[in-house]
């Protein structure tokens, strides 16, 4: 059963953080790549700390071994310097899909007793 095996590694490009550059009076979009470097199919979901400022498309999906997906991370216009951005980040969560499951994302994969891994990508705002 897939759930008894810990999920393998993923890679992200960029690997450690996302950087948005001023001006912030218009929406910015930054692309990141998520690569399933494990030998099993995984389901992934993306969470953001600040949902009114940050969005991710697609927010979830399924990746076969060695498959990659390009995600659009968008930052809506905001008043830079007047809002707290210190804790802004996106979090990639992933788990193995059950054996024989269709290649269609299901939220319940993350709600059972299977292991879920996380990778945080802090967001940096350049003035």
Curated annotation (Swiss-Prot):
SUPFAM superfamilies: PapD-like. Central component in molecular interactions underlying sperm crawling. Forms an extensive filament system that extends from sperm villipoda, along the leading edge of the pseudopod. GO terms for cellular component: cytoplasm; cytoskeleton; pseudopodium. It comes from Caenorhabditis elegans. InterPro entries: Ig-like_fold, MSP_dom, Nematode_MSP, PapD-like_sf. Its main location: other. This is Major sperm protein 49. Sperm. The modification N-acetylalanine is found at residue 2. Keywords: Acetylation, Cell projection, Cytoplasm, Cytoskeleton. Around 30 MSP isoforms may exist in C.elegans. Residues 9-126 form the MSP domain. It is found in: Cell projection, Pseudopodium; Cytoplasm, Cytoskeleton. It comes from the Eukaryota.
């Amino acid at each position: 059963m897939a759930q008894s095996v810990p999920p393998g590694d993923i890679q992200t490009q960029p690997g450690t953080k996302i950087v948005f550059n001023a001006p912030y009076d218009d929406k910015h979009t930054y692309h990141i790549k998520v690569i399933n470097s494990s030998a099993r199919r995984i389901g992934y979901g993306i969470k953001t700390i600040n949902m009114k400022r940050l969005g991710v498309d697609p927010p979830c999906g399924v990746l076969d071994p060695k498959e990659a997906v390009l995600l659009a991370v968008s930052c809506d216009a905001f008043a830079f310097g007047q809002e707290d951005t210190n804790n802004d980040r996106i979090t990639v969560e992933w788990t193995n899909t059950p054996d024989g499951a269709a290649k269609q994302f299901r939220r319940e994969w993350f709600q059972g007793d299977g292991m879920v891994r996380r990778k945080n990508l802090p967001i940096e705002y350049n003035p």
